Amino acid sequence: MSATEQQVDNTGKHYFDQGKGVPINYLRLHEILMDAFAQAVVGKGAERHMQDKPFEQQPIQLISQMVGSNAGLIYQVCKKSQESLRMSKEPAIKELHGAIVYAAAAILYLEENA
């Protein structure tokens, strides 16, 4: 793949593989995603669900495995997004971070089960 092709590579992986870090035009997106990650690791998600287990072995994933669908995860994305509309700024942001984590869990389910 040429350097030009790498610049338009839609996976984004080449930036990290080549040690380039986060593209400046996507810095805010990266920060928001990292805030959602932090909420899952040390915030509400960790307090309620982590139990010193990897993300793939936490209830967020295991329940979907048991029922054979990621529909519950998608429901949570929708529910949290809708609930954020009735909240003030900071609680709404936290709720949307939760929606991001549920979306990531839905992606993980598809990657492992499709």
Could you tell me what each predicted segment is?
Residues 1-114:
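Intrinsically disordered, low-complexity regulatory regions
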